[in-house]
Amino acid sequence: MNNYWPSSQGPTLNQEVAELLVRTSIKINKRLTNCSQEVLILDVFRTEVKRNLLKIILAELEKILLEIYNSNLDVNDITNLTENILIDLFHRCIKRFCKLYELDCIDIYQDIHDLNYLLNDYKMLLQILIIQLLFGSSQTVNKTFNLFTYNMPVKQVEIFLENYLIQLSNIIAHMLVQNFNTVNETNASYLCNVKFLSDRKLEKLKNNLIWNTIIKNYLERPRAIYESRYKVWGFYQEGLNCQYIYACRSNELQMLSPMQIIITFLLEVQDFFVPKIKSTIFLIGQIIIYAGQNLLNQIMRTSLEILRRSSNFKKQSNSL
């Protein structure tokens, strides 16, 4: 395997893509335990169900790549059609997964539009991934991650593919769980982890998902955009894990809602006041410590002086 991703279309790029898909498929068959401290809705499912969902997404993504390749689309076409490609990929994966586990997928198709805040992230990921896999590293279309250099490590492309598979499987898991009614009616007993095999726990999970969506939408996402960070997931030897990487997301600031903009404003206020408050508290603490030390020294000197005088007084009394 080469250390760098091919910079243009050709047999070398095709071979690298094929090898990358094979390596990723092998990783999916290994441990899928969430080893991070982050919430991953995919953990609701049993390991075998998670593995099947990831395999479906990888297979459908491979089909879409072949369709785009055979359609002779250029980079501009992909940029303009990314959202349609994303929704099509989502629908294909849902359809195959629901068919495999005999689930009703009609309502789930409609729910993707309720998560519009995620579309921009997934569009960006899919666009970058398709361009890398079909056109090579020389296509400098999106500088978001500053990775589109002439010599792009193969590992970076691998990370993007793994991250996209895990992220998309997570949002599909979110959609599926939100549409579960009861454990018995939805075949959830066959899909879900043993920790969620009761109607009460299932409803509790759905309520937690609503809260988790609010937190991600109005707190975590604006903060990540403002701090130019992006969370990427990957397959590791111990299981699934994530890390934050640099991502220039200035353009996304303009698309934030008023509530999200308030969060960024509060972050600015925090950046302005918190260091000064900490410095002030530190200074006051130093003053208190200094004053306390002086007071303690004064008390000790006074006590020693009293003891010395008392000792001298006793000696004088004894001599008399």
Curated annotation (Swiss-Prot):
Keyword field: Chloroplast, Plastid
Localization per record: Plastid, Chloroplast
Domain of life: Eukaryota
Xref: Pfam families: DUF3685
GO cellular component labels: chloroplast
InterPro entries on file: Uncharacterised_Ycf55_algae, UPF_Ycf55
Annotated family: Belongs to the ycf55 family.
Protein's name according to its UniProt entry: Uncharacterized protein ycf55
Source organism (scientific name): Pyropia yezoensis (Susabi-nori)
